[in-house]
Curated annotation (Swiss-Prot):
Keywords: 4Fe-4S, Amino-acid biosynthesis, Branched-chain amino acid biosynthesis, Iron, Iron-sulfur, Leucine biosynthesis, Lyase, Metal-binding
The protein's name: 3-isopropylmalate dehydratase large subunit
Gene: leuC
Native source organism of the sequence: Thermococcus kodakarensis (strain ATCC BAA-918 / JCM 12380 / KOD1) (Pyrococcus kodakaraensis (strain KOD1))
Reactions mediated catalytically: (2R,3S)-3-isopropylmalate = (2S)-2-isopropylmalate
Coiled coil: none
Subunit structure: Heterodimer of LeuC and LeuD.
Biological process annotations from GO: L-leucine biosynthetic process
Function as written in the Swiss-Prot or TrEMBL entry: Catalyzes the isomerization between 2-isopropylmalate and 3-isopropylmalate, via the formation of 2-isopropylmaleate.
UniProt keyword Iron-sulfur, yes or no: yes
Family: Belongs to the aconitase/IPM isomerase family. LeuC type 2 subfamily.
Length: 380
C-alpha cells in the first residue's frame, strides 16, 4: 500500500469524497475564490485561513484595493488573515495548522510543501477551493505513486534542491501527470525536507509526501538516488527539468541572485548562504527572501542578517518576493538570474526576454560572489 492510499483510505484509481482538515489561500487567489463562493455558499467552514504573501505590501492601488476586498470578506466570514508574516506554506507548518491532519488543500500549486509532514497536501483551483471552504470536503481520484528512495549521504555542498533538480530531470520523460512522489530514507533536515515536497509539483506530480518505512508495494515506478555521488546541480532555462551538473554551465555571467522563497527561504538554507558570504562582497545584485517573519527574526538574533547586509545583499520582507515576477526584484530584458526558487519558465520572474537558472542556496551564494555561475567545489 502506498502512502497516498493509506491517507485517502482507498486504492489507486478510486474516486472518493473526503473531509479536508485544512484549507487555505493567499492574496493572489482569494479574489476569484470569493466570487465563486458567493455564488454558491453563505458560510465558510472553520478550518479556513488566508495569507497575504504573494504581493505584500501592496505595490499598486489595484492590488491594495483587491486586498481590501479580501479583508472585508474575511471579516464577514471570521476567517483569520495573516498579513506579511511570510509565505503561506511555511506559515502553515510553523503555526501547526496541519498538525494531526491527513488531508490539506490550498489554492496554490505548491501546497504539496506540507507533504513533508506526511500529509496528503494538494493545490487546487479557485472554484474547487470555494467548494471546500463551503462544504469542508471535496473529491479526489487516488493517484498512482512513484517512489524515490535515497541512498548514501549528500556531499557538504549538495542540498535538497540539487537532489530535486536531479529527480525532476530524471522523471522528465516519464508520464507524471496526477501521480504522487513518495520519498523514503530521507537524510535531509526538516527545513530541507520541505524543499523536496515543495519541488515535487515541478515534476508534474500531484503531490509529494515523505514517509518513514518503504514497503515497495504498489508503486508504478521506483527511483533510487545515490546522494553520495550526486554533484551540485543547476536547472537551465526554461524548465526545472533541464538539470545538469553546475560545472557544465560554470562561468555563465549573471545579473542577479535570489536566495529565498517557499523552496529555499528557511533559516538553515539562508544560514548556508551566509556562511559563504561572510566577510565577502557580492559582485551582482543579491536578494534574500526569508520565508517567514520567524526566519527573519532568527536571522537578526543570530547576526546572519548583518552578515548578509555587510556583504551587499538586500533582505526583503518575508514573502514570495520576486519569484512570481510582480515586485521586489523583477527581471528586466536580457537579465540572467540565478534563483533558488522552483520555477524558471520564460517570463516567470519578469521579462520574457530574461533567463532563469535554478540552483541551491550554496551554489547561488558562491555565484553571487563571482558574478557568474560557480561550482561549490571550484570556488569554496
Amino acid at each position: 500500500m502506498t502512502l497516498v492510499e493509506e491517507l485517502l483510505g482507498a486504492k489507486t484509481g478510486e474516486v472518493v469524497v473526503r473531509e479536508v482538515d485544512l484549507v487555505y489561500a493567499h492574496d493572489g487567489t482569494m479574489p476569484l475564490i470569493i466570487e465563486a463562493f458567493r455564488r454558491n455558499f453563505t458560510r465558510v467552514v472553520p478550518r479556513t485561513y488566508v495569507f497575504f504573501d504573494h504581493v505584500f505590501p501592496a505595490p499598486t492601488v489595484k492590488i491594495a484595493n483587491l486586498q481590501k476586498e479580501i479583508l472585508e470578506f474575511a471579516g464577514e466570514q471570521g476567517i483569520p488573515v495573516i498579513q506579511g508574516q511570510g509565505i503561506s506554506h511555511q506559515l502553515a507548518v510553523e503555526m501547526g495548522l496541519a498538525d494531526n491532519a491527513r488531508i490539506v488543500v490550498g489554492a496554490d500549486s505548491h501546497t504539496p510543501t506540507l507533504g513533508a509532514l506526511g500529509v496528503f497536501a494538494v493545490g487546487i483551483g479557485a472554484t474547487d477551493t470555494a467548494v471546500v471552504m463551503g462544504l469542508g470536503k471535496t473529491w479526489f481520484r487516488v493517484p498512482e505513486s512513484v517512489s524515490v528512495v535515497f541512498e548514501g549521504r549528500p556531499g557538504k555542498n549538495v542540498m535538497a534542491a540539487d537532489a530535486m533538480i536531479h529527480i525532476i530531470t530524471a522523471l522528465r520523460d516519464f508520464e507524471m501527470n496526477y501521480k504522487a512522489i513518495e520519498f523514503f530514507n530521507v537524510p535531509f533536515s526538516f527545513d530541507e525536507r520541505l524543499t523536496l515536497t515543495n519541488f515535487s509539483v515541478e515534476a508534474n506530480a500531484k503531490t509529494g509526501i515523505i514517509g518513514e518505512e518503504y514497503s515497495g508495494d504498489g508503486y508504478v515506478l521506483e527511483l533510487g538516488i545515490d546522494l553520495s555521488s550526486l554533484p551540485p546541480m543547476v536547472a537551465k532555462p526554461h524548465h526545472p527539468s533541464n538539470g545538469v551538473p553546475v560545472e557544465e554551465v560554470e562561468g555563465t555571467k549573471i545579473d542577479q541572485v535570489f536566495i529565498g522563497s517557499c523552496t529555499n527561504g528557511r533559516f538553515e538554507q539562508i544560514e548556508r548562504a551566509a556562511e559563504i558570504l561572510a566577510g565577502e562582497e557580492v559582485a551582482v545584485r543579491t536578494i534574500i527572501g526569508p520565508a517567514s517573519a520567524n526566519v527573519y527574526r532568527r536571522m537578526i538574533e543570530t547576526g546572519i542578517a548583518k552578515v548578509l547586509i555587510d556583504a551587499g545583499a538586500v533582505i526583503l520582507p518575508p514573502g514570495c518576493g520576486p519569484c512570481l515576477g510582480r515586485h521586489m526584484g523583477v527581471a528586466g530584458d536580457g537579465d540572467v538570474i540565478l534563483s533558488t526558487t522552483n520555477r524558471n519558465f520564460r517570463g516567470r520572474m519578469g521579462s520574457p526576454n530574461s533567463e532563469i537558472y535554478l540552483a541551491s542556496p550554496v551554489t547561488a551564494a558562491l555565484s553571487a560572489l563571482y558574478g557568474e555561475i560557480t561550482t561549490p567545489e571550484g570556488g569554496a
